[in-house]
Design a protein with these regions (language model features):
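Conserved beta-strand hairpin/beta-sheet module of binuclear metal-dependent hydrolase folds
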Residues: 1-44
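Generic structural signal for residues in well-ordered beta-strands
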Residues: 5, 78, 96-98
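Short, solvent-exposed polar/charged micro-motifs at secondary-structure junctions
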Residues: 16-17, 60, 107-108
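Short glycine-enriched loop/turn motifs at secondary-structure junctions
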Residues: 22, 71-73, 92-93
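Active-site metal-binding motif and surrounding structural segment of the metallo-beta-lactamase
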Residues: 34-85
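Metallo-beta-lactamase
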Residues: 82-108
């Protein structure tokens, strides 16, 4: 199964990567504005509307800046652990629908 991994940006101003397989189109972190994520995905011929999920590594703002906009407006599932969910909900004063995983455990 071919895997495509593209780093869309990494640094103190934001972190975001795109992972694609035959069945999955995953954004890893959402540390840029929704507009910037759209532009960065467009530069590789992709769009946020086609994402199958967003994997959040942790709750720092340079990893979650547009997470509420992506998940709520575009109805994209969010994958994270419970502490990250709670921190993001507190930070943005919103409720996220997350598919939770345990840190260190495998999941599909």
């Amino acid at each position: 199964m071919p895997v495509r991994l593209t780093i869309l940006g990494s640094g103190s101003s934001g972190n975001c990567a795109y992972l694609e397989t035959d069945e999955t189109r995953l954004l890893i972190d959402a540390g840029f504005s929704l507009r910037q994520i759209r532009q960065r995905l467009a530069s590789i011929g992709r769009a946020p509307e086609n994402l199958t999920g967003i994997l959040v590594t942790h709750e720092h703002s340079d990893h979650v800046q547009s997470l509420p906009a992506l998940s709520e407006k575009l109805r994209i599932p969010v994958y994270c652990n419970r502490p990250t969910q709670e921190a993001v909900e507190y930070q943005f004063q919103t409720r996220l629908v997350c598919r939770l995983f345990e840190t260190g455990a495998s999941f599909e």
